[in-house]
Curated annotation (Swiss-Prot):
One of its GO terms (biological process) is translation. Binds to 23S rRNA. Its main location: plastid. It is found in: Plastid, Chloroplast. Belongs to the universal ribosomal protein uL14 family. Disulfide bonds: none annotated. GO terms for cellular component: chloroplast; cytosolic large ribosomal subunit. GO terms for molecular function: large ribosomal subunit rRNA binding; structural constituent of ribosome. Part of the 50S ribosomal subunit. Keywords: Chloroplast, Plastid, Ribonucleoprotein, Ribosomal protein, RNA-binding, rRNA-binding. This is Large ribosomal subunit protein uL14c. InterPro entries: Ribosomal_uL14, Ribosomal_uL14_bac-type, Ribosomal_uL14_CS, Ribosomal_uL14_sf.
Amino acid sequence: MIQPQTHLNVADNSGARELMCIRILGASNRRYAYIGDIVVAVIKQAVPNTNLERSEVIRAVIVRTCKELKRSNGIIIQYDDNAAVVIDQEGNPKGTRIFCAIARELRQLNFTKIVSLAPEVL
């Protein structure tokens, strides 16, 4: 469960290292974001000499959460940290590599570019 003021790790090589969620997109009073949701975030830490800078406002897709994800077949998926992938306005990832295994639900939500870059789909 990601809510405003939650710090997120970045799971790609876009240039950001840590994000802070400032808004959850989708509804005006939505409280939590889960895997596959788009959030507006601000960059808290960035790699030097990259296109992204600290305090820049960006969009990101949640790919890992500490809160468990329950599937209809009874499988429960839970990660050790909260992480996101930086995207542009069209929903394409800004990075060229993704460093973690991601959930199958992202494919159903039409984030096929992110799924194709991931090393493993759970």
